[in-house]
């Protein structure tokens, strides 16, 4: 990978995590006129490493960052003042993803930045309260969205704690399949066999834990009224470039689950004809859906 080109408008901050037992870094963007505003809404953008949404050279397709997308929309009047948070939810070298889990076996890897492996508790108990305190963030106006594994984590976060968010978005999310009507994880899902998930899921896989700590089973266990209150925004790439170029089938699966729960997709189009699994397309998704998040956030301001 090329040398990261971190957007200078992204402020690095350190979060001392009681859950992880270490200090973790994240990036935060605060609009220049924040001091003129009341408490601002927050969008948490997830992927893996904290740099990914704000790195101009994250992949060769990219021509900007999430901040470029936001500031263009703000100048057009499509969104209002908004804090964006880019947390690190993987090892410091981005080789070991957490899946927004409290890892089963963090001792299996020597990668830096994992600590106890309790990333789910870090996100909910350490990071989010710290952002609210430090940046005058609105305590109820929060959105969460992600790309790829970030989409999985955004859906899981909203399913586990729908009380914390107003909207949730996923672009080409690596949504895990469930079985038995959504009561259990589908243990034959090929994604689960990837060795990069050994720390998160254990070796052999801790299936009892996986059945519970799973985006779809969590969604189906959640309070129906609470998850229906959220605005759900789901997009993914086209079927033609499956399996390596998009997560079309996983996106379709998520929409079927949401439909069974009586939840409509707020995205204008679900399967994007040119929706490759790239950062260029992730930024395009953000440009199309950030005004939808803003509409949901504005209702609680």
Which sequence ranges carry the predicted segments?
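Non-catalytic cap/lid and distal C-terminal segments of serine-dependent acyl enzymes
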Residues: 1-301
């Amino acid at each position: 990978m090329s040398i990261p080109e971190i957007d200078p408008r992204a402020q690095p901050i350190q979060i001392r995590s009681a859950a992880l037992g270490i200090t973790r870094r994240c990036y935060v963007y605060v609009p220049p006129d924040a001091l003129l505003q009341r408490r601002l809404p927050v969008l948490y953008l997830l992927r893996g490493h904290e740099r990914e949404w704000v790195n101009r050279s994250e992949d060769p397709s990219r021509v900007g960052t999430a901040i470029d997308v936001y500031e263009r929309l703000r100048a057009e009047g499509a969104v209002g003042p908004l804090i964006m948070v880019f947390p690190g939810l993987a090892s410091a070298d981005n080789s070991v993803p957490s899946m927004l889990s409290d890892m089963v076996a963090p001792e299996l890897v020597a990668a830096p930045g994992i600590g106890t492996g309790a990333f789910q508790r870090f996100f909910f108990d350490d990071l989010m309260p710290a952002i609210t305190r430090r940046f005058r963030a609105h305590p109820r106006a929060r959105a969460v969205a992600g790309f790829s594994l970030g989409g999985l984590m955004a859906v899981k976060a909203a399913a586990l704690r729908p009380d914390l968010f107003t909207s949730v978005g996923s672009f080409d999310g690596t949504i895990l399949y469930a079985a038995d009507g959504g009561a259990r994880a589908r243990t034959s899902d090929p994604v689960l066999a990837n060795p990069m998930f050994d720390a998160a899921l254990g070796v052999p896989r801790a299936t009892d834990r996986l059945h519970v700590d799973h985006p779809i089973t969590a969604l189906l266990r959640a309070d129906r009224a609470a998850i229906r209150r959220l605005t759900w925004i789901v997009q993914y790439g086209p079927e033609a470039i499956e399996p390596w170029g998009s997560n079309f089938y996983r996106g379709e699966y998520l929409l079927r689950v949401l439909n069974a729960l009586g939840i409509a997709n707020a995205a204008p189009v679900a399967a994007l004809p040119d929706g490759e699994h790239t950062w260029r397309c992730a930024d395009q998704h953000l440009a199309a859906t950030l005004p939808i998040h803003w509409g949901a956030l504005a209702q609680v301001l």
